[in-house]
A protein has these predicted regions:
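ABC ATPase NBD coupling module
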Residues: 66-82, 218
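Non-catalytic connector elements of ABC transporters
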Residues: 246-316
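A short, proline-enriched helix->beta-strand linker immediately N-terminal to the Walker B motif
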Residues: 146-150
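Conserved ABC ATPase signature
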Residues: 127-131, 135-137
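Conserved ABC ATPase "signature" C-loop
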Residues: 206-207
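Helix-to-loop junction immediately C-terminal to a conserved catalytic motif
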Residues: 50
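Conserved ABC ATPase "signature" region
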Residues: 108-124, 175
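Catalytic Walker B motif of ABC-type/P-loop ATPase nucleotide-binding domains
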Residues: 152-156
Length: 316
């Protein structure tokens, strides 16, 4: 049996559609990510799945049972689905342990495992107003996990976190999946968060799913320029680019990522001029002007502005 079956979900705000006929299935332990621009309907979809927002049409089935909306029950939500908002809040004037005990549905041993997984066992005696942003996020995560959810909906969990706390929270999510058997749906604006984690990515645009697939497929073969832009820099295959690289005329791709280009000494390569070179840590991001195109290329070495280079491209 599928963990989650979303069928025909639509939601309007006034005359405008927030979601249009959303359909998908999530299997147990499947890592499902949702990508889309601000206002595309991602948060509304998560809240409908959690039973916090009433859909206008369609059904959400969780382990074979329909998830009721807030208009159908006294207390909104589903006991086995936890929604963690990017706008998390913790009550003031409480110790961390007290906040967690209010929500806890686990045995003491299982609750202690959650605290360990979330890296908060040393924070239990702290007051809620004595916590850093990263600590508050992990405690909110633990507060969701102690309700014993089978499905965790993560809405921009890494927003407003520095690199260190982002890394810690990613490890916490991984351990929750592996040690607590929790399935997750993740929404993030950072393509690295989604591409490195997901088994499958859904791309939403104006309330509709426009693409679904493995991270490699969604990244390398986006269905539109909108989908391409969500996951980083790209180059549109134009007639001018085809004139420089004739084999592209038979290429199925509409867009090419920077990693597909190479700067080398190939005599058959197209000649370009370096516009800029920026150090990105493990590589340089090089902007190159060609006769009819401008390309972004990832390269291992710095190249001076104005230098002439030859560009080749990987065929498929």
């Amino acid at each position: 049996m599928s963990l989650l079956n979303v069928s025909g979900i639509s939601k309007k705000q006034g005359e405008a559609f927030l979601l249009r006929n959303i359909n998908f299935i999530q299997e147990p332990s499947q890592r499902l990510a949702i990508a889309g621009s601000t206002g595309s309907g991602k948060t509304t979809l998560l809240k409908i799945i959690a039973g916090l927002v009433q859909p206008d049409d369609g059904n959400v089935m969780f382990e074979g049972t329909r998830v009721k909306g807030p208009l159908e029950k006294l207390l909104p939500g589903h006991p086995q689905i936890a929604y963690l908002s990017q706008h998390f809040e913790l009550r003031n004037n409480y110790r961390v342990e007290e906040l967690l005990q209010m929500a806890n549905k686990l045995s003491q041993a299982d609750a202690e495992l959650v605290y360990k997984v979330c890296r908060i066992d040393h924070l239990l005696n702290r007051w809620s107003d004595e916590l850093s942003g990263g600590e508050r996020q992990r405690i909110s995560f633990a507060k969701a996990l102690v309700t014993a959810p089978a499905l965790l909906l993560l809405d921009e969990p890494f927003s407003n976190l520095d690199a260190i706390h982002r890394s810690v929270l990613k490890s916490v999510i991984k351990d929750a999946e592996e040690q607590l058997n929790t399935s997750c749906i993740l929404v993030s604006h950072d393509p690295v968060d989604l591409l490195s984690w997901a088994d499958e990515i859904m791309v939403i645009h104006e309330g509709k799913i426009i693409q679904r697939g493995a991270p490699e497929e969604v990244y390398n073969d986006p269905v539109s320029e909108y989908a391409a832009a969500l996951f980083g820099k790209y180059c549109v295959i134009t007639p001018g680019l085809i004139r420089l690289f004739p084999f592209l005329e038979n290429d199925k791709r509409r867009f090419i990522r920077p990693a597909a280009f190479e700067i080398n000494a190939d005599e058959n390569g197209a000649v370009g001029e370096v516009i800029s070179s920026s150090f990105m840590g493990s590589y340089y991001e090089v902007e190159v002007a060609l006769a009819e195109s401008k390309l972004t290329i990832y390269h291992t070495q710095n190249i001076l502005r104005g230098e002439a280079v030859r560009i080749s491209i990987q065929s498929v």
